[in-house]
From Swiss-Prot:
Disulfide pattern: none
UniProt gene name: rplF
Protein purpose: This protein binds to the 23S rRNA, and is important in its secondary structure. It is located near the subunit interface in the base of the L7/L12 stalk, and near the tRNA binding site of the peptidyltransferase center.
Any one Gene Ontology cellular component term annotated for this protein: cytosolic large ribosomal subunit
Official protein name in the record: Large ribosomal subunit protein uL6
GO MF assignments: rRNA binding; structural constituent of ribosome
Signal peptide residues on this chain, from the entry's feature table: none
Pfam families: Ribosomal_L6 (PF00347)
Keywords on record: Ribonucleoprotein, Ribosomal protein, RNA-binding, rRNA-binding
Lipoprotein among keywords: no
UniProt xrefs under PANTHER family: 60S/50S RIBOSOMAL PROTEIN L6/L9, LARGE RIBOSOMAL SUBUNIT PROTEIN UL6M
InterPro entries named in the record: Ribosomal_uL6-like, Ribosomal_uL6-like_a/b-dom_sf, Ribosomal_uL6_a/b-dom, Ribosomal_uL6_bac-type, Ribosomal_uL6_CS
Amino acid sequence: MSRIGKKPVQVPAGVTANVDGQKVTAKGPKGELFFVANDEVSVKLENNTVVVQPVNESKDARAKWGMSRTMIENILKGVKDGYERKLEINGVGYRASMQGKNLQLALGFSHDVVYQTPEGITIAVPKPTEIVVSGINKQQVGQVAAEIREYRGPEPYKGKGVKYAEERIVRKEGKKK
């Protein structure tokens, strides 16, 4: 029995949810998202709560049960509040700036890295050493933040590079003489 899957998902105020077979659609103040559940689970909308149940007791159905419930919860929260991920840049001369819709990063390479902002994502640079990625799709926000971090991940000796704001870098000691 899935501990996460058996909890019903409350539809937040200001959000309308619609279940059409396996497709769950959510409309809210920030936009509209949908999720198509696997055939191994059944999705029902009962008095402003979405209930997800496995079709049978197979291991595959039970594995997809909790994941489907969490995906539905993520789209309901995304269209109401949205998601955001903060990144920090550490290092001498390392900085970020916006050039139109593109993010320009100076990360110690011989050239600046230009990252094209995907559709549905907003990137803000409040300070030259801080990047805020926001959007309504949790998976897409996390993916964009990971792609930006990947250009120059934090190194363990001085901590230089791009890291998540809440990330703690485990530091190493340098060589001994």
